[in-house]
Amino acid sequence: MAESGVEILCVGTELLLGDILNGNSRWIAEQLAGLGLPHYRQTVVGDNKERLISAVREARQRCRVLVTTGGLGPTPDDLTTEALAAAFDTPLEERPELWLEIQQKLSAGGRPVAPSNRSQAFLPRGAEVLPNPKGSAPGMIWSPRPDFTILTFPGVPSEMRAMWTETAAPWLQANAGTSGVFVSRQLRFSGIGESDLAERVADLLASTNPTVAPYASLGDVKLRLTACAPTADAAAELLLPVEAELRRRTGNHCYGVDADSLASVVIDLLKQRHQTMAVAESCTGGGLAAALTAVPGSSSVFQGGVVAYSNAVKQALLGVSLDLLTAHGAVSQPVVEAMARAARERLNCDWAIAVSGIAGPGGGSAEKPVGLVHLALAGPGGCEAWVQHFGERRGREAIQRMSVIRGLDRLRLCLLAQV
């Protein structure tokens, strides 16, 4: 007997080989949690009919609902519908009204109608069409067995999401026996490691409703809080006291929630204080400016930046003296201090972050190894500088990313400390 619950089956050799990031499974998992549907397994299968059939038959033994993405196009390697029908010895039938709709959609979009498109109008006997409002590839809702239902979606994320929202989610709510509504909230932390954070909140990690789970990524640690209740409002209420206690224990290490980034938080703090900022970058190559300008509305507080990669540009655009560069080198505290002060003055702003380091893989020495980064922050109260040792094992991209994070976080803390 199959368990109650949902499995996700993503189809496509491009997913299996890692050529395309599988964002569909993550999004669907979030939607299932919001519907209160238990979800225990995700599978990726390449464009191979026999392996698809095997994966579907195995899922049949474990779950009551199988959600598939991919393999619904008109090309020879789009095998999902054919494999599903074969898995349950069910013939495919052409749906004339569906074929007409496919032709109309293609023509309306200025695309030619190829003979191969007709294959998309074939569904297993007894299947219900799952309409695609954004594309030509229809999905289906099909129950080949009384206690087992399959929902199929194309792999294109925008099409899949529209189909889910308009048709699949209401169907699942009405037919899949939800156990409650799950609500999640993610707290984001900086300047604290995963193990240190876990020690501070060890007792809360053992709670069951809400659950608290740590996740770590480069320069960022997260705690995901998840609660289940009959309604979304009731689940959200369960989260409130736990979130308050987590914030109390971690202080300013907690910089935001959910989609917040350090850059977006810094932008908001600057707006609240009617202040502006700029950057002067060397080893990050514009990474600081890119992070800030990725935030909508950043133009009201971000004046601009200088990517001074060479010593000549440091001299010409930031006025760093040749004597300073000769005496200390580009990767040094005196130079980043001069860069930060110059950026603040020349771009006429309240704050300026400067960074210069050795991101590698070459260019390091015993005195200044790969991973050494000097940063400075010039502000209304003066200029402070500090050094980070990220180590050469992290790699160039990680060193650059960590430098951006450390610079933004120092500015965040200084803004919070303002009276």
UniProtKB/Swiss-Prot annotation:
Disulfide bonds: none annotated. InterPro entries: CinA (IPR050101), CinA-like_C (IPR036653), CinA_C (IPR008136), CinA_KH (IPR041424), Competence-induced_CinA (IPR008135), MoaB/Mog-like_dom_sf (IPR036425), MoaB/Mog_dom (IPR001453). It comes from the Bacteria. CDD domains: cinA. Gene3D superfamilies: 3.30.70.2860, CinA-like (3.90.950.20), MoaB/Mog-like domain (3.40.980.10). PANTHER family: NICOTINAMIDE-NUCLEOTIDE AMIDOHYDROLASE PNCC (PTHR13939), NMN AMIDOHYDROLASE-LIKE PROTEIN YFAY (PTHR13939:SF0). Belongs to the CinA family. This is CinA-like protein.
